[in-house]
Amino acid sequence: AELTEARNLQTGTVYIAASEVALRCLLLPVLKQYRLLYPGVHIRISNHSTPQAIAALKDGAADIAVVTTPTVRSASLVETVIRPIQEAAVCSSAFPALTDRPVALSEMLDYPIISLGPDTKSFAFYSDFFTDHGLPFHPAIEAFTADQILPMVEADLGVGFVPNEFLESESRVCRIDLKEQIPERQVVLIKRKGQPLSVAARKLEHMIIDEK
């Protein structure tokens, strides 16, 4: 059996549906290690919003999905929480009034908000966050992917919300010290219930879960 498993890890393809945030905040170093261990396995990554990734998983176009909460619950899927991520409000130096003091969430409404589109769970997350504080959420600019938000903020187009991991080597934007705490999100791994993974996909699943 061990010989068969080793042989199965020399070839084959693993299909991953991943959101941009999950890719950057969790997956990339795992994939690097996986490639070092199993260079013969092909990795196919499709970049999706969370709902799109889950749809790809249900359709059989992906072996596993790695996305951020909130997710789309389904009786046919199994979800494993891997790690929390914390997001921050950011702006450029073009908005100095937001950078030198604690800022109320309501003040963000005075500036153009950059967000992902309404068909994403990120939009739903921030819509709920604003609603919970009695505020409307009407972004002025909609980005197609999460990694577009930071360049738009850098270009002085408005304010946005990005994971702390996006800011670790980023000095061209300013964190906004929000008075209200942005709720934590989770990176989760999702797979189809009752459907066995290939040896190569199962090995990657275990490596991702080991990041917990």
Language model features with spans:
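Alpha-helical "hinge/linker" immediately C-terminal to small N-terminal DNA-binding modules
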Residues: 1-8
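Central regulatory/effector-binding core of bacterial HTH transcription factors
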Residues: 11-73, 142-143
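A late-sequence structural motif
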Residues: 26, 177-212
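Ligand-binding cleft/hinge of the Venus flytrap
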Residues: 30-39, 106, 123-136
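Alpha-to-beta junction loops
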Residues: 58-66, 87, 135, 153-159
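Flexible hinge/capping segments at coil-to-helix
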Residues: 74-113
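Beta-alpha-beta core module
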Residues: 74-85, 147-194
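Secondary-structure junction motif
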Residues: 97-98, 112-133, 197-205, 212
